[in-house]
Regions:
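Terminal targeting signals and extreme-terminal segments of soluble enzymes
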Residues: 1-144
């Protein structure tokens, strides 16, 4: 399979430029690198992403998963289209107290009107923390 990125879209550049002033920056999510069909990012496990018992909040993991899948999906469609979330699920399999978690989004299906992405989130030791799957709708980009 060749690179899935369309119309010269760069997932790294688009995500870094468009993420300012969003949940992405509030949670400290960073895009790290991209391959031909994957996007990788990380998020700190700290007071911004903890639940009351000092562990990584499951919702923060889902925010990381959705961020990665949405950016990757939008870069895998024509310039006049964007991707928006329709459904996301997550299984939280290991707690994390501090450090960083890393997510990698890879496509399961890239259709004309919808996409399905898998996102694996691991801790700094590479142990699985969360596995997520997201469905995106492919819609016309707003030009206003």
């Amino acid at each position: 399979m060749g690179a899935i990125w369309r119309d010269g879209k760069d997932p790294m550049g688009l995500g870094q430029a468009s993420g300012r002033g969003t949940l992405m920056t509030t949670l400290g999510i960073e895009l790290l690198d991209a391959g031909e069909d994957w996007l990788r990012g990380r998020m700190p496990v700290d007071e911004r992403t903890h639940q009351p018992f000092g562990l990584l909040h499951g919702g923060a993991s889902v925010a990381l998963a959705e961020t990665l899948a949405s950016w990757a999906g939008t870069c895998a469609v024509d310039a006049d289209k964007v991707c928006v979330g329709q459904e996301i699920n997550a299984n939280h399999v290991r707690p994390v107290r501090e450090g960083w978690v890393y997510g990698v989004a890879t496509p399961e299906a890239l259709g004309r009107t919808s996409q399905v992405w898998s996102i694996r989130i691991t801790d700094e030791a590479g142990k699985l923390v969360c596995i997520s799957r997201m469905t995106l709708a492919v819609v016309p980009a707003r030009r206003d």
